[in-house]
A protein has these predicted regions:
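N-terminal Rossmann-like FAD-binding beta1-loop-alpha1 element of flavoenzymes
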Residues: 2-27
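Short hydrophobic core segments
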Residues: 5-7, 29, 178-190, 330
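Active-site substrate-recognition segment that forms the wall
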Residues: 18-19, 47, 73-79, 189-311
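Glycine-rich FAD pyrophosphate-binding loop
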Residues: 21-40
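Helical element adjacent to the flavin cofactor pocket in flavoenzyme catalytic cores
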Residues: 127-181
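C-terminal catalytic lobe of FAD-dependent flavoproteins
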Residues: 276-359
Length: 359
């Protein structure tokens, strides 16, 4: 018997469980053989404060100090750059404003990323304040915190039944039975399915695929200090990763919850958009994969107790911002579960509670 069972061992569930383990006995159930298998293990792992809806940006900002300072800090400088062709002037102006980016010369852009082809782009903008997040260490440290506080993490524990009882919940997973007073739904793309299994109305979580290719360092260059660079309106992006380059078509195709894989056609189109801005064609892929970014109907995170069943707590709809927002989102969730007044402003909390999605 635990005070709390958390369903889902990605960054959302692990961070929530870590915070809650300071006050409650916690068990995390993850159906895969390892934690962080789905979206969390496939993330491009950037911390960019100005990225997302206003409520997401507020969570990013509230997470910044933790990312910078906790356990020696998880951030390393990366920077962001946007490049655009002449016909995309208007979209470029929009990006400059939304992302707080400084316009730079074409020459400076080519200094930052030497494979860019100056004949192919007209506008460039750069922003120092984009950082790589050490996602693996962040997850491992939350896991350590859970275990230090006596919590359990059970893998290969696919939930097959959830039953409401007078004093809480009974969950059958991986052939074992778990009893808990409260249930945290941190199941990512499967969050609505978990709700339905528990007899709770779904909230309309939509998984969207995001594909990724890893290509060899173009021209064998040392690209450690390159920024992450984007096409305008996030039509593609590229980012250095362990001596290679990640390139994504920035796709958002709606798919069923699944162990996602990259769509070859979507990947090819995205790589072509990237090639349209650089001198070096893509000749081979080292690897390709996809992850699911899961969104609520209004694209804001869903954090807090279900209005019809307060012992069922949503931790869902991270939409690709799971790592960025984890420190503040998990703290808010723990505050709401404990019944203490959250540190975050009341109007922000209202934009995140599941109540907003119930007519």
């Amino acid at each position: 018997v635990s005070d709390i069972v958390v369903i889902g061992g990605g960054i959302a569930g692990l961070s929530a469980a870590a915070r809650l383990s300071e006050h409650f006995s916690v068990t995390v159930l993850e159906r895969e053989p390892a934690t962080g298998y789905h979206a969390s293990g496939r993330s491009a792992a950037m911390f960019e404060q100005n990225y997302g809806l206003p409520s997401t940006v507020a969570l990013n900002k509230a997470s910044a100090q933790y990312h910078r300072e906790a356990n020696g800090g998880y951030l390393s400088p990366r920077g962001l750059m946007i490049i655009a062709a002449r016909e995309d002037a208007e979209a470029f102006d929009d990006d400059v404003v939304t992302m707080g980016i400084e316009r730079i010369s074409k020459d400076r852009a080519v200094e930052l990323v030497p494979i860019l082809d100056p004949a192919k782009f007209t506008f460039a903008g750069h922003h120092e304040a984009g950082y790589d997040i050490d996602t693996d260490r962040l997850m491992q440290d939350f896991i350590r915190q859970i275990r230090r506080n006596g919590g359990a993490i059970v893998t290969k524990a696919e939930v097959t039944a959830i039953t409401r009882q007078t004093d809480g919940w009974q969950v059958v997973a991986g052939g074992q039975t778990y009893d808990a007073a409260k249930l945290i739904n941190a199941a990512g793309a499967w969050a609505d399915a978990v709700a339905q299994a528990a007899g709770i109305a779904p909230i309309g979580i939509t998984p969207r695929r995001r594909s990724m290719a890893r290509i060899p360092a173009p021209e064998d260059r040392d690209l450690r200090d390159w920024p992450m660079f984007f096409g305008v309106g996030e039509s593609w992006y590229a980012k250095p990763d362990a001596g290679a380059l990640l390139v994504s078509p920035a796709d958002e195709d709606v798919v069923a919850p699944q162990d996602a894989w990259a769509d070859d056609m979507v990947l090819a189109e995205g790589l072509a958009r990237y090639e349209g801005m650089v001198r070096t064609p893509v000749t081979r892929l080292l690897a390709s994969w996809a992850g699911l970014r899961s969104f609520a109907p209004d694209k804001a995170l869903v954090l807090g107790p279900d209005p019809d069943e307060p012992d069922f707590i949503w931790c869902a709809g991270q939409g690709g911002y799971g790592f960025q927002t984890a420190p503040a989102a998990s703290q808010l969730l723990a505050d709401l579960v404990r019944g203490v007044t959250p540190a975050l402003p009341h109007d922000l909390v209202a934009q995140l509670l599941p109540d907003r999605l119930r007519a």
